[in-house]
Amino acid sequence: MNILLLAGGWSSEREVSLQSAELITSAMIEYGHTVTCLDPLYDFDKIVEVAEKQDVAFILLHGSPGEDGILQALLERVGCPYQGASPAGSLLALHKAAAKALFRREGLLTPKSVFLPLKPEVTWEPGLNYPIFVKSNIGGSSVNVHLVTNYEELFIAMEALFNAGEEVLLEEAIIGQEVTCGVIDDQALPPILIRSQGKFFDYYNKYAKNGAEEICPAPLEPHVLKHIQEYALRAHNTLNLQGCSRADFILRDDELLFLLEVNTIPGMSATSLVPREAAAMGLTFPELVEKLIQLAIRDHRK
């Protein structure tokens, strides 16, 4: 097949995307596909023309325009199948506050939070218990995440994000173990337990070779593993996602599971989580990529 691989872009995760593209290109060639790579940072105006001549597109862009539904909408308009979530599902998952509202509606536990699209007054109080995570409302890989323990730290962290033009999400920190679980189609993968070297699983820990200890399958009781997988599937379906997604959680000592967010374009680098979970199920990296391609074609035909 002729495949359009879209990688790079202009988000803070650009380099991760480009590194992953090399691995995915090799996997596609192994299955006999012909790959055309475009980087929207330089080739955005070529996407429509090239996509019309392809059998399928593979989106490997984090943030805009890959995870916010823009490329998905373009590809749908020209009739080119692509892997993963629809434009609506992509945008809902990327907008953390919107996703959390739907999770709560479906009875999925998620930490208490406050969404701030604009900078509040100096006298404003968050109404949350410290410590608090201060996050960019739109973004992934734990970029622009700060853990604060008091009011002064809170405003410094918020100021930095607002000055960068970001919307802010405040979230009560849950004390527990970090776990993550991928979903492919209607099947949850073996969860991973993450023991980070820092205070939390931030951008450095996620992509550095020795940044965190990631144990797969997670060494947890069978009923806990099943619960994590069920939650990941429910989150996937709540956002009406297709293809592959990855849900991130905090598991408290009392076994309460808190859903943090869902990623619609999980990392596909050498150290990424979903490829490791797929490997635990017996899927090689090329097999995983091929499965996502076949799902893209199937979903397009529905």
From Swiss-Prot:
Keyword flag RNA-binding: no
UniProt superkingdom: Bacteria
The record's free-text note on cofactor binding: Binds 2 magnesium or manganese ions per subunit.
Binding site for ATP: 127-180
Record field: catalytic activity: 2 D-alanine + ATP = D-alanyl-D-alanine + ADP + phosphate + H(+)
Intracellular or extracellular location(s): Cytoplasm
Keywords, comma-separated and alphabetical: ATP-binding, Cell shape, Cell wall biogenesis/degradation, Cytoplasm, Ligase, Magnesium, Manganese, Metal-binding, Nucleotide-binding, Peptidoglycan synthesis
InterPro entries: ATP-grasp, ATP_grasp_subdomain_1, D-Ala_lig_Van_CS, D_ala_D_ala, Dala_Dala_lig_C, Dala_Dala_lig_N, PreATP-grasp_dom_sf
Gene Ontology cellular-component terms listed: cytoplasm
Binding site for Mg(2+) 2: E261, N263
Binding site for Mg(2+) 1: D248, E261
Keyword Cell membrane attributed: no
GO molecular function: ATP binding; D-alanine-D-alanine ligase activity; metal ion binding
E.C. no: 6.3.2.4
All residue ranges annotated as the ATP-grasp domain in the record: 100-294
Pathway(s) the chain acts in: Cell wall biogenesis; peptidoglycan biosynthesis
GO process annotations (BP): cell wall organization; peptidoglycan biosynthetic process; regulation of cell shape
Cofactor: Mg(2+); Mn(2+)
Pfam families: Dala_Dala_lig_C (PF07478), Dala_Dala_lig_N (PF01820)
Enzyme class: ligase
NCBIfam families on file: D_ala_D_alaTIGR, PRK01372.1
Function summary: Cell wall formation.
Family: Belongs to the D-alanine--D-alanine ligase family.
Name assigned to this protein: D-alanine--D-alanine ligase
